[in-house]
């Protein structure tokens, strides 16, 4: 992708479409540090470094990749761990401080509540929140990736091929969930397809 300039307004849902191999994923992949890129991103009036996943996420930008097994899921971890891990590591959510913050422990109750909320809202078909992500269907894995992004409470959310490889009922549910999240949180969503 070369010479692309986008101005996206808060709360907007924007679609980027094109043929396979045309580079449409270069935008979120560059911002999130998944592919080397050059240029500049100004987000909420602040210049952010490209090629830096941590800085993007700290500044409220998340990305749900179509490559859920490559960059989206921790396949050998539970659903609750998948949903809350990034928020725990980057935002220090789902953590209980002790001794004035000298010691920190996972807040298993808060993790369970968050996971159960998204399992219910996104109709993730599973035994419970402790089921391993690898044992879910592709559609349910995609829903876990979406829940993981929602748990980060992003202000800008990139979503690549959100309905690829999932059944028709789940497609509607995923698109409705994105719309609902946008409306309830005034989150800017960019859908790449």
Can you describe what each PLM-predicted range is?
Residues 1-193:
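Glycine-rich phosphate-binding loops of nucleotide-dependent enzymes
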